[in-house]
Amino acid sequence: MALIRRVALLSLHTSPMEQPGSGDAGGMNVYIRELASALAEAGVEVEIFTRATSASQPAVEHPDPGVCVHNVLAGPTKKIPKEELPGLLHSMVEEIEQIRRRQPHGRYDVIHSHYWVSGIAGLELSELWGVPLVHTMHTMAKVKNLLLESGEQPEPRRREVGEHRIVDGAARLIANTSSEAAELVSHYGADYDRIDIAPPGVDLATFTPAFRTKARRDHGVDPGTFHLLFAGRIQRLKGPQVLVKAAALLRQRRPDIDLRLTILGELSGNKEFNLRKLVADAEMDDVVTQLPPVTAPELAAWFRAADVVVMPSFSESFGLVALEAQACGTPVVATRVGGLSRAIFHGRTGLLVDGHHAADWADAFEALYDDPATRVDMGRAAAIRAQNSGWSRTAAITLESYHAAVDRHVGHLVPAVPVT
């Protein structure tokens, strides 16, 4: 078996150093940073490459022992829409190659790219360096386009074409769940034998069920309040509009419930999506509190302060928030879609809802409100189940994928030309 000493992780469209829940930062950012840290703990040197988005960013950051982040200069040193990144691929690849040449080691054993833009760059670098590419999609254009709401902009054709090229050219593909692996096969014709399934983990030192009473008190949640919590980017795909409608319906049905809804996150994507207006139109201003994203320790405290964490997503490759909330001992109500259907044990650690009808979601909330003993049991079961989901497990599976990629690498890769 080949020895993996050094890995280049590509996350060109968003930095793992960014705050999850803002801009394009979300579960993928957490995934990359935690995976890198766990790989480093396993003895692998990890170098992450991301595009610099501020003139004040240092060229190199060292977030954890054995992990460094290169802020690659390509295009303007500011945040730009993801749609403009393909035009910078050539300059990003050139800059990464220059960084590699300046390194004393001068070589990586594996390239691991995340998201399609990084995958296209990864194909070029794989050919240039003569090392295998391992790729994790995180989201897929064809899957997202199947779930579009009326009036929403579809993912561009060039992304679909790019993802097909990545599937054909990568030595290994890593999926978060078996359902994501099935989507790679059905939508992109991937060879199932080249797919490894590495479920995301959770930071079990941060996301713990301790001090729930203190968390509620610290966040001003009264003992009798039924507290619903949403944490994530504010975009239609994540479904906060479904949650607001369902909470409003629950309030109409059950005026006896002292209801509170906290939304942690910032607007991402379509700037016309106005959550505050939706809240006002539903006459829920006195119930809903919208706050910016918070650090992981504070997020864990918010999870502990909630009775239920809600994820009404239209698509999720995994749904890291669901796992983190359960690790804090809080049941999760989520859409039965993608990785959420596996992250949550329906009836044991939370509830899965089919579709996005507000009445169905209100039914789920009402059922849990009326049965506090079940909520407690679900929370306990959720915390116990999460104990088997540390990042070391994810890193071990990922390392196996790297080994398989290196062992099977024969130097023949699909010619990599940036998609235009």
From Swiss-Prot:
InterPro entries cross-referenced by the UniProt entry: Glyco_trans_1, Glyco_trans_4-like_N, Glycosyltransferase_grp1, Mycothiol_biosynthesis_MshA
UniProt binding sites for 1D-myo-inositol 3-phosphate: H13, D24, A25, G26, G27, M28, N29, K82, Y115, T139, R159
Leader peptide range in chain numbering: none
Residues noted as binding Mg(2+) in the record, renumbered to the chain: F303, R304, A306, T330
EC number, UniProt record: 2.4.1.250
Source domain of life: Bacteria
Residues that bind UDP-N-acetyl-alpha-D-glucosamine: Q19, P20, G27, R233, K238, V294, E316, E324
GO terms classed as biological process: mycothiol biosynthetic process
Listed GO MF terms: acetylglucosaminyltransferase activity; D-inositol-3-phosphate glycosyltransferase activity; magnesium ion binding
Gene3D superfamilies hit by this protein: Glycogen Phosphorylase B
Keyword terms of this UniProt record: Glycosyltransferase, Magnesium, Metal-binding, Transferase
Quaternary structure (record): Homodimer.
Biological role: Catalyzes the transfer of a N-acetyl-glucosamine moiety to 1D-myo-inositol 3-phosphate to produce 1D-myo-inositol 2-acetamido-2-deoxy-glucopyranoside 3-phosphate in the mycothiol biosynthesis pathway.
Family: Belongs to the glycosyltransferase group 1 family. MshA subfamily.
PANTHER family in alphabetical order: SULFOQUINOVOSYL TRANSFERASE SQD2
Protein name, per record: D-inositol 3-phosphate glycosyltransferase
Organism: Pseudarthrobacter chlorophenolicus (strain ATCC 700700 / DSM 12829 / CIP 107037 / JCM 12360 / KCTC 9906 / NCIMB 13794 / A6)
Gene that encodes it: mshA
